[in-house]
């Protein structure tokens, strides 16, 4: 059996790999998207399906007002003592010497839940993980962050004992590692194998310099010695490798005794004419940070990536029977169910009757007008990840705005300061019109502002479509669902990427979805008959 990377396409970073018997799970970060954390299941490490979105209550995750790329950072999923343990950080500030990250622990008897109410685990850092030692003791690891550590890019990994009976941490913090010259040490996981404790961390920052670093010690407190090659995995030395940014590893031994590591990776698109080693030459990744898997071999008591330390497109699978490919469900959503399809998410807040309804008009998704796409509070946005470099997304909408502060339509979205929006609104003296707007690093542009497209009064429905073609994308519209007209604007798909956004809010990936806003607060709504996403 051969596994093709990435195993989780589109925005699925910071994988945490976990085994229960012959079942395997990966938890990934969701940042400002709700519900928080996505958990995938497999029995062969090749075919994966989404089975749980555990942080689905405000009591577990209150992100209203969180900044772009705040929210859920690097969850840690483990199984011990007959239940699943999930650690996560809700980051409230991203661009300062303070993160104000709030760490929590929830547990569940089954991966589907029910998940407990969260136990606070302190606010001193991020990327927490939990290690269950063979003697039953439990240890909590994380990267501390604050004014002093902010100025020191090496940072540290610290550990505290955790008492599961009282839900409390020991006040003593033990420093396990102070980093290598690669800097930006984070994403720590601890393992025990063949008489050694192994500490696996991410370093180099989560861009092209990203790497996995491993250390070991005979005692849990250390001292820890570095891997002979320092970096166990990185793609930094191979700029033409199709899988880049490889790092943030999570190790696992299968029930057949084989070893694998999940890691995050990205597939860059290179711009024509830009030299490989020039600024931007390595490319742009609109699909965000995805999840890959590597096969691990042990030599002289150290783990190594089979085939070399770089991320590889194909990997030999474990000695288990290949399972049927996961049924992903129709890529057409007719909104006939009583709840949103799990592939759809909202921004920061749950989908409730403030945002919309699936029952107000059966067979339609009704979105109520709320904040603009520029907001970080209450937005009526329902979207899904870009998972392919070429695809078409389409919807049919019924919407009757009465003034210019009301709009609804289709968006391609990276964060609150970088998106495009093809929408219907209202112009006095003209009636309903179709326009597009782009926000690029928070700078707006309205290419059709002087000549909007008039919607015929007889048009009961309006169809909107976006075609993404590798580096560019274009919107189009129809008034009958058969004859389509292109909006005369071409947008650059590569700009909806971590690499273009930069700064401190660049941890997600591009989404496409439906949106309705009413900044007047008068209370409009839009009804969406369907939403399709089809790779081309």
Q: What positions do the PLM features span?
A:
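Carbohydrate-active catalytic/glycan-binding domains of CAZyme proteins
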Residues: 1-536
């Amino acid at each position: 059996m051969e596994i093709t990377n990435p195993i989780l396409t589109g925005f699925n970073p910071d994988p945490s790999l976990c085994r229960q018997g012959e079942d395997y799970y990966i938890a990934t970060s969701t940042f400002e998207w709700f519900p928080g954390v996505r958990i995938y299941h497999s029995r062969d490490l090749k075919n994966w399906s989404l089975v749980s979105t555990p942080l689905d209550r405000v009591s577990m995750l209150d992100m209203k007002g969180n900044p772009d790329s705040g929210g859920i950072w690097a969850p840690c999923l483990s199984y011990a003592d007959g239940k699943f343990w999930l650690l996560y950080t809700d980051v409230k500030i991203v661009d300062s010497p303070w993160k104000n990250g709030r760490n929590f622990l929830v547990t569940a008897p089954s991966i589907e839940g029910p998940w407990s109410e969260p136990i606070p685990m302190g606010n001193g850092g991020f990327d927490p993980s939990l290690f269950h030692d063979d003697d039953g003791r439990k240890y909590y690891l994380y990267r501390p962050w604050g004014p002093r550590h902010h100025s020191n890019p090496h940072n540290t990994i610290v550990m505290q004992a955790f008492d599961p009976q009282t839900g409390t941490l020991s006040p003593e913090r033990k420093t396990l590692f102070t980093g290598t010259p690669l800097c930006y040490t984070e994403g720590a996981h601890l393992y025990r194998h063949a008489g050694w404790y192994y500490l696996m961390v991410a370093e180099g920052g989560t861009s092209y310099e990203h790497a996995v670093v491993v250390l070991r010690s005979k005692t849990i407190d250390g001292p820890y010695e570095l891997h002979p090659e320092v970096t166990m995995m990185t793609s930094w030395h191979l700029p033409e490798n199709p899988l880049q940014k490889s790092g943030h590893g999570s190790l696992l031994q299968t029930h057949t005794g084989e070893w694998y590591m999940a890691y995050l990776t990205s597939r860059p698109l290179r711009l024509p004419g830009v030299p490989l080693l020039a600024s931007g030459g390595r490319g742009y990744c609109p699909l965000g940070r995805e999840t890959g898997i590597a096969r691990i071999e042990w030599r002289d008591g150290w783990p190594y990536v089979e085939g070399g330390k770089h991320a590889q497109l194909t990997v030999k699978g474990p000695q288990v029977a290949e399972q049927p490919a996961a049924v992903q469900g129709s890529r057409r959503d007719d909104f006939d169910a009583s709840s949103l399809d799990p592939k759809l998410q909202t921004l920061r807040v749950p989908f409730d009757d403030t945002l919309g309804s699936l029952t107000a008009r059966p067979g339609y998704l009704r979105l109520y007008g709320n904040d603009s796409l520029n907001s970080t509070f209450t937005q009526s946005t329902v979207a899904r990840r870009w998972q392919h470099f070429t695809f078409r997304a389409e919807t049919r909408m019924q919407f009757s705005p009465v003034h210019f502060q009301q709009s609804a339509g289709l968006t391609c979205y990276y964060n609150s300061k970088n998106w495009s929006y093809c929408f219907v609104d209202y112009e006095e003296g003209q009636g309903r019109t179709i326009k597009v707007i782009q926000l690029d690093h928070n700078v707006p542009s309205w290419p059709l502002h002087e000549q909007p497209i008039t919607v015929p009064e007889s048009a009961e429905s309006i169809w909107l479509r976006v075609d993404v073609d590798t580096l560019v994308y274009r919107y189009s519209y129809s008034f009958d669902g058969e004859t389509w007209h292109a909006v005369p604007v071409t947008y650059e798909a590569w700009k909806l990427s971590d690499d273009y956004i930069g700064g401190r809010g660049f941890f997600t990936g591009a989404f496409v979805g439906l949106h309705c806003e009413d900044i007047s607060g008068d209370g409009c709504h839009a009804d969406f008959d369907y939403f399709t996403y089809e790779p081309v």
